Amino acid sequence: MTPLEYIDRALALVAQRALALPGHDVFQHLTQQLQYVRAVLLDRGLDRSRLHQITIGSVAVKEFDETDPELARALKDAHYVAVQTGRGLKIDLP
């Protein structure tokens, strides 16, 4: 999978969970952050400074690690992509 595919997978899972639990604000927060990461991956000219403030990984662990491991894994992978992109490093995911 490409870095963009990891972000798209996380976005799809978040959208699916948001439909099942409408009104759960955490999904809106995650969607906004994932869309920003996606935009940065698609347009290298965008400001990357906000990538250092991404909280996708901590939300994954706090909110979903125990209750929804599939979503938690996708969010952790997306967080890794964001961090590595923000640092300008190569992204190595399985």
Name the predicted role of every residue range.
Residues 5, 12, 20-22, 42, ...:
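Compositionally biased amphipathic helical and low-complexity segments enriched in hydrophobic
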Residues 53-94:
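Amphipathic alpha-helical binding modules
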Residues 15-62:
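Amphipathic alpha-helical interaction modules
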Residues 1-31, 82, 86:
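Short terminal alpha-helical segments
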Residues 14, 31, 35, 39, ...:
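A ubiquitous, low-specificity "background" feature that marks scattered single residues
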